[in-house]
């Protein structure tokens, strides 16, 4: 069964009790704010360096430091590569294109760059809405379409001035990102969607965290068809959260079951880095020398000494 969710103030009180129980004598939760590398959207990019662009939703960029994309740059040698987080909260693979955000990002992409594409959390929404611009994409990866009304007119982007939109499938939108990126001489890379703090009992009688919210197979099918790497950060993150357990993991999701704290965002960024290494991605050549991750100093996590940002030698959770 799913673990119950509570109001934020109640969750905060519970977290204080959990931390105090795990670390006797510690006055409440002391999860530290990790090293920040928030990069303004309008930060000039060094034209002589390749750039790693991040295209996604609030799980990659949310407020000041709650998205993993804002904890990504310090893992890299930024004298050799630019990191550009272009994720926008609330977007889906469809709405990021429709509102013109993809065109703005694409205008900055040059030959030799990389584009990390991570969409899905908002693609399951309602395709048509009378109150706002729809976000949901069609199910599947095919070329089937549907003509739907544009409830709230666009003033910019590909739907500017139009009253009817052609709705495509999730896979179609991914293929558009891929084709557009390649047309600029850059390399597209798909990322599996971040995991949510939703737990259910498995056949082994133990609680397991949700690893797929319905888009994983689509990503892999598109990746295989288009010969694009799929970086499985979701499995790396899920392994870490299951190692921590439901109670400690809940400390990292104080808002809801989708959005993390700054510490959780740091862990997700570390999971992306680990997944890139595991896949022998060309992005690994730009990584800075490994250092202990900021979240390791959190008392609630010190009871789990093998929770690491980077895969280490040996067996066990260090491989996460």
Label each PLM-derived region with a short phrase.
Residues 92-101:
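Structural motif
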Residues 23-35, 48, 246-320:
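Conserved catalytic region of serine esterases and O-acyltransferases that act on ester linkages
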Residues 88-93, 198:
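Acidic helix-start/capping segments at beta-turn-to-alpha-helix junctions
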Residues 6-17:
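Bacterial N-terminal signal peptides
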